[in-house]
């Protein structure tokens, strides 16, 4: 198994698919990476040379924010919104949907399990 950005990527998959196991790299970024390194799209991870793996590592380290760094950046951005006290920050603080979804019904994923209210009848 090749280890890139602290993640063991599967050896039996194509490189484009295997790179997507790294948090922060999706289809588009994976395709860009193999284009920069000039690896054929149908090549499997097990067929990569050590030099190619090293080149992929260098491209990711140089050009992309991945794994822990990306998670930290997102957390900092959310904390900044909460500290500003803007609408999006308040929604994050209260654990409600941030992007305008309805909350009268639904939004159970964001709000958590339903809380029963004593004495309320249908």
UniProtKB/Swiss-Prot annotation:
Query: What GO terms describe the biological role, i.e. biological process, of this protein?
Result: translation
Q: Which residues span the membrane?
A: none
GO CC entries: cytosol; small ribosomal subunit
**Which region ranges are annotated with the description Disordered?**
95-122
State the Pfam families in the record. Answer: Ribosomal_S13 (PF00416)
Entry annotated with the keyword Ribosomal protein: yes
Alphabetical keyword list: Ribonucleoprotein, Ribosomal protein, RNA-binding, rRNA-binding, tRNA-binding
Q: Which InterPro entries match?
A: Rbsml_uS13_C, Ribosomal_uS13, Ribosomal_uS13-like_H2TH, Ribosomal_uS13_bac-type, Ribosomal_uS13_CS
Q: Which domain of life is it from?
A: Bacteria
- Show the SUPFAM superfamilies listed in the entry: S13-like H2TH domain
Report the GO molecular function annotations.
rRNA binding; structural constituent of ribosome; tRNA binding
User: What role does it play?
Assistant: Located at the top of the head of the 30S subunit, it contacts several helices of the 16S rRNA. In the 70S ribosome it contacts the 23S rRNA (bridge B1a) and protein L5 of the 50S subunit (bridge B1b), connecting the 2 subunits; these bridges are implicated in subunit movement. Contacts the tRNAs in the A and P-sites.
Q: Which family does it belong to?
A: Belongs to the universal ribosomal protein uS13 family.
On assembly, the entry states: Part of the 30S ribosomal subunit. Forms a loose heterodimer with protein S19. Forms two bridges to the 50S subunit in the 70S ribosome.
- Protein name per Swiss-Prot or TrEMBL: Small ribosomal subunit protein uS13
- The gene name reads rpsM
């Amino acid at each position: 198994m090749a280890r890139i950005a602290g993640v063991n990527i599967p050896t039996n998959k194509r490189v484009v698919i295997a790179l997507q196991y790294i948090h922060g790299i999706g289809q588009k970024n994976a395709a860009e990476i193999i284009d920069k390194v000039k690896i054929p799209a149908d090549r499997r991870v097990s067929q990569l040379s050590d030099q190619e793996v090293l080149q992929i590592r260098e491209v990711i380290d140089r050009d992309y924010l991945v794994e822990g760094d990306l998670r930290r950046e997102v957390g900092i951005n959310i904390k900044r919104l909460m500290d500003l006290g803007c609408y999006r920050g308040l929604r994050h603080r209260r654990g409600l949907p941030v992007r305008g979804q309805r909350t009268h019904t639904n939004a159970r994923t964001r709000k958590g399990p339903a809380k029963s209210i004593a004495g309320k009848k249908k």
